[in-house]
Every structure is written in structure tokens, then in C-alpha cells.
Amino acid sequence: YDLYFTTRMPPFMQDAMGDVFRTDNDAKGAVKNALYIAQETGIPLSATFNNIWVRPDQKNLETFITNFKFLYDNGVRCATIPHTSWVSTGQIQREYPELEIKNTILREVSKPNEVVSLASAGFHYINLDRDVMRDRPLLDRIVEAKKYCHSKGNDIMLSLLANEHCWGGCPIMPEHYQYNATRVGSDPQYFNSTISRVSCSRWEQYDPASELKAANIPPWREDWEEFLDAGIDVFKLHGREDAMRLKESMDIIERWANHDEMMQPTFSEYMDDVEMPEAPIN
């Protein structure tokens, strides 16, 4: 397990979450906070560079390698790198040989051959697209790809995003992330902009099936255990820049540790309302 955190440094001065740090001191302060939490808790850190709209060129790669040294020297041994071409060069690994590299959820990895290609490039940890959790035959094929990678000496971990609450197959999501990752100055974050009126912020108000369309892991513990048994290694919990979602993620961790049957108890109330006691949501 690890604690992933927003990291702002050239060439990554923005990411898909959309928050703008007004000064360099703000960005450095966020890093120092993360380092302090890691020191106090013993939980390893994972630096997140979640912007596929930063040009994947050689100059930016070299800028990244130079600026990452501060984090590496302070004990960060895991990072989300958004560009396969950068990882494929091997430059990052040569400079930082102990670094474990994650891909980004923004690449929407959902095919076995994509998993094999990423493992061959040098990724250690593959974030799968959230839609995979609703397609068991596809998940089984991806797990077979993981086993194939192991047979070739490329051990990887597979991760599912557990509780982001985004709809599966959302037609707006890529544009939402692009908007945030390219916003500057005083531009509002996506969901505070007028264009978001055609997105999930409206759907959630008018579609009574909104909760059922969210690509979350179902709330029952047995469903989470089924994913582990199937070959998923990591559940990625949301909340990097959302205090309420962070609270929900911490509650899930506590419930898992306590062996509770229900990971998200709010669903109990929902089930009572629609007279669906113990009916699985799949």
C-alpha cells in the first residue's frame, strides 16, 4: 500500500484534478506535507504526475528527471508516470533504480495486450480502466496477461479504482480531465465551469439510477474479496483533492480492517428505500 499525492513540478504544473497552486511555495508545501505524513505514519509515498497533455518529448523527460531528484532523495520510491515513451527509454530507471512506476488511469487501459505492452515498457503497477470491474470475462483475460508477464520476468500488480463515483463509460470524462489538466490562472475547475452543465453534475440530479451507473466496486465485502481472488492486487481509493471522498476512503479502510460486511454503509439506506435487501449491485 502507499499514499499517493499531487505533485507539482516542471514540466507537470497541472494535473487532471484541476487544482492550481498559485506559487511555487504552495506546490513545495504540499510535498513537504506529504513527506511529513510519511515520516509520521511509515506509509510509503507515491508521487502522482497525472497529466497526459504534457508533451512527451525528450526535453520534458530530462526536465522531469532533474526535478524528481528532490523527491527521490527524500525517500519517494513510487511514482505515476503518464507517458509510456518516457518509461520505455529506461532513462528514469537508470537515474532512479529503486523507483516503482505506475501508469495513469487516464490512459484507460482495458485490454490484455495493453497490460503486456506496459509491463514490457517497464511499468510495475497497472491502473486498469474503471469499466473493467463490470466485465468479468475481460478481467479474467487481463489476469491471464498478468500471468504471462510473470512468465517473461515482468512482475506487475493490477489495480482497480474503487470509489471514484464516476459513471462507467462516461462520454465526458476524457474532456473533463483534459479541461482540468490544461487550465491556467483563474480558470475555474471543471465542475465550477459553465460547460459542466452537460456532465454528471446534472445527471446525478435527474437520473434516479445514477448510483447504479457509478463504476464503483459494489459495497459488499464479498465483492471486494472476489476481485482479490480473481487476481487484482490493489484497490486504489479516491480522495487526493476531495475531503469528503478522502473521508469515505478512510472509512472503507477501517471497515475492511474490522471485517465489516458492508464497505459503504450508505448503500444500506439506499437498499431499504428501494426494497432491495441484500440484493447485489452488479
List the model feature ranges, each with a label.
Residues 1-114, 124-282:
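Active-site pocket-lining/capping segments in soluble small-molecule metabolic enzymes
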